[in-house]
């Protein structure tokens, strides 16, 4: 049947009449919708009634007729709308999309599950975190219940309607899209602008294959100003359905009342005001309880979201490894990579965070395609997502072990001795060792009985006639990293390289090959080479001297870091007294308005004036006086312990607007009695 009648008209007078177009007047309304007329409305904007109609048509007893209707809105140039051809390209594009939806039996492509956004205010910044429900739980029935999640976009506005974020125009030059301050997407080869499902000639930006993150720190904010953040998850659309369906994203909902005050917000929206910390506030901090990271990498935990931390909770960071290559028949010789990181809350005995090859942030893990293994990113330091308000900053600048010349040396005593790593096999034996000297000249004797397969520092095979077995040494080499199944340390084997080929062990000329012995008695591999060529009787190491041989290496499965979150309930009285001197009124002078004041779109609403006191105690009393000493207003501050600002609406105690002029303020900290007196000016 199609659309047979359309009328748009003002609400008629409520005077009693049987002929007015009002819903209780059956005959008038029947005649209205039964008339074959499509009439546009160009009169004044007012309270309008919109009537669509199709018909008349017969509706027989027992028969069901289904009616489908679509109401489309577009911005189109008046020149085209008023032309004989009545061109409306934006409207026609919408019609194409609606037609596809109709033909698909109203099964819409759905956006991903809505994330929950959390905003934590700080001094000059806002920390934004969100959960992972969108990227892990999304299923789109329109596309066969697949997870079509693609990424996140984060928007910031100072307007409750997000109007100042809507700066991207469509193909017709009409502002239509919001510009994100942060975007991240899956590393899946889907990036850039779509060439399907164009909205008024504009494709959807799928991102840059950055990898997914669940945290963003916005440093481009001003203390005391209220910001509105919105986070949307988006999918990658449906390019193969009809003309293509554009990617879908979550809605941002900010519900306002008649006074334009926020009534409710969606869970993906956060309203936050950054602030200076309160006078006397003791910031939470972290204590490193125990660090066992001998390999050389660094992990620094930092508190990012104060509101989410758990007081006095202890955490342990641990690692998972993947073996890349190994020495045959030797349990302590292999090349490995660190492929995962996990954090356990020791108080709750619960894993609260982890990254591994199946779930990681951005480029925190990378894959070596040629050898088919995953590793923590060694090219640059990286940060984890936020867990319990904490973020880990990780720096592991190497993916294989190597000799650490800078941190190797004498732990106890001294002497002339040279330690040289091998160019290949050391990477299989990159542990920490102690060379321990003894008063017993035969404290260790060579164990291996087979001369073949022994290599020197430059990876050359040493001829068997240059190998001396059964030699005794006045020192031994202990592996400080690995333990045997009985809990004892692994001892390294040693053989002599008879450099001068005289068949006798000459300490001043020959070299000592240090390595491991296989289960079958053969040499497993060389860790390093020792020589005393430069030592004299006076400079030869003495009994109880210890030399540390250190290798830098990726995080090992037995490495760990333990730390505790410290949160303080009280205030620092000395700090409070000093900070009271820094109390300021912003802006001072107040001239007509300032950026902290929220805009109102209703012309009949008054301006929401605002003046801020900063660096104030969390519990305090402010009294404001005229210059002649008349009390204007009192402000009782009862902030959260960390919040150090308070806004004044610039109204008197009687609810009247204050006059222009000079004012005095008196602030008293309720906890300590410290006081501050100052002044500010108001110019209207």
Identify the residue ranges that each predicted region occupies.
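Glycine-rich (often Gly-Gly/Gly-Pro-rich) flexible segments and glycine-rich loop motifs
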Residues: 1-43, 105-107, 161-163, 294
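Short, structured beta-strand/loop micro-motifs enriched in basic residues and often containing a Trp
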Residues: 43-51
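Short Pro-Gly-centered flexible turn/kink motifs
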Residues: 58-72
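Polybasic, low-complexity Lys/Arg-rich tracts in intrinsically disordered regions
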Residues: 63, 83-654, 681
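Short glycine/proline/serine/threonine-rich loop/turn segments at secondary-structure transition edges
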Residues: 78-80, 655-661
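C-terminal tail/sorting-segment detector
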Residues: 662-684
């Amino acid at each position: 049947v199609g659309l047979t009648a359309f009328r748009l008209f003002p609400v008629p007078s409520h005077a009693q009449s049987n002929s007015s177009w009002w819903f209780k007047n059956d005959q008038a309304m029947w005649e209205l919708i039964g008339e074959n007329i499509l009439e546009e409305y160009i009169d004044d904007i007012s309270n309008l009634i919109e009537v669509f109609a199709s018909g008349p048509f017969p509706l027989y007893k027992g028969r069901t007729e289904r009616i489908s209707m679509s109401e489309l809105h577009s911005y189109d140039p008046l020149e085209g709308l008023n032309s004989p051809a009545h061109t409306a390209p934006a409207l026609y594009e919408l019609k194409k999309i609606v037609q596809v939806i109709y033909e698909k039996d109203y099964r819409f492509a759905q956006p991903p599950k809505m994330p929950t956004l959390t905003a934590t205010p700080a001094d000059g910044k806002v920390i934004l975190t969100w959960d992972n429900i969108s990227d892990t739980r999304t299923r789109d029935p329109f596309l066969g219940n697949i997870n079509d999640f693609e990424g996140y976009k984060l928007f910031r506005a100072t307007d409750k309607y997000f109007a100042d974020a809507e700066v991207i125009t469509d193909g017709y030059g009409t502002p239509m899209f919001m510009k994100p301050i942060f975007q991240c997407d899956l590393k899946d080869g889907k990036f850039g602008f779509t060439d399907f499902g164009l909205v008024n000639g504009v494709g959807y930006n799928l991102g840059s294959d950055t990898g997914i993150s669940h945290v963003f720190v916005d440093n481009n904010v001003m203390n005391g100003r209220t910001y509105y953040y919105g986070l949307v998850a988006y999918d990658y659309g449906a390019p193969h359905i009809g003309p293509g369906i554009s990617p879908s994203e979550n809605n941002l909902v900010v519900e306002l009342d008649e006074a334009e005050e926020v009534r409710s917000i969606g869970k993906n929206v956060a309203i936050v005001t950054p602030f200076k910390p309160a006078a006397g506030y003791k910031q939470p901090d972290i204590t490193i309880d125990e660090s066992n990271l001998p390999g050389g990498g660094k992990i620094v935990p930092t508190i990012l979201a104060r509101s989410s931390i758990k007081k006095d909770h202890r955490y342990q960071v641990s690692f998972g490894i993947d073996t890349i290559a190994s020495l045959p028949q030797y349990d302590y010789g292999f090349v490995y990579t660190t492929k995962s990181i996990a954090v356990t809350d020791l108080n709750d005995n619960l894993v609260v965070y982890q990254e591994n090859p199946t779930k990681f942030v951005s480029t925190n893990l990378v894959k070596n395609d040629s050898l088919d293994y995953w590793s923590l990113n060694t090219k640059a330091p990286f940060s984890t997502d936020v867990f319990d308000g904490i973020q880990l900053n990780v720096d592991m600048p190497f993916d294989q072990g190597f000799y650490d010349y800078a941190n190797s040396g004498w732990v106890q005593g001294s002497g002339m001795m040279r330690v040289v790593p091998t160019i290949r096999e050391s990477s299989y034996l990159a542990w920490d060792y102690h060379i321990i000297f003894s008063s017993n000249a035969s404290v260790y004797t060579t164990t291996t009985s087979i001369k073949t397969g022994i290599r020197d520092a430059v990876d050359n095979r040493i001829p068997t006639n240059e190998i001396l077995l059964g030699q005794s040494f006045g020192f031994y080499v202990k592996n400080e990293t690995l333990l045997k199944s009985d809990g004892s340390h692994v001892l390294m084997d040693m053989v002599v390289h008879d450099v001068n080929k005289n068949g006798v062990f000459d300490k001043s000329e020959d070299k000592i090959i240090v390595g491991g012995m296989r289960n079958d008695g053969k040499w497993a591999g060389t860790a390093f080479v020792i020589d005393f060529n430069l030592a004299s009787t006076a400079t030869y190491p003495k009994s109880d001297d210890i030399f540390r041989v250190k290798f830098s290496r990726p995080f090992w499965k037995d490495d760990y870091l333990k730390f505790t979150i410290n949160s303080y309930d009280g205030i620092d009285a000395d700090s409070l007294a000093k900070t009271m001197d820094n109390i300021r009124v912003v802006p001072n002078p107040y001239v007509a308005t300032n950026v902290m004041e929220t805009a109102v779109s209703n012309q009949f609403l008054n301006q929401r004036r605002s003046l801020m006191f900063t660096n104030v105690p969390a519990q305090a009393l402010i009294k404001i006086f005229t210059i002649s000493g008349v009390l204007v207003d009192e402000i009782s501050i009862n902030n959260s312990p960390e919040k150090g600002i308070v806004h004044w609406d610039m109204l008197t105690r009687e609810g009247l607007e204050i006059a222009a002029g000079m004012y005095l303020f008196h602030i008293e900290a309720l906890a300590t009695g410290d006081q501050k007196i100052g002044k500010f000016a108001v110019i209207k």
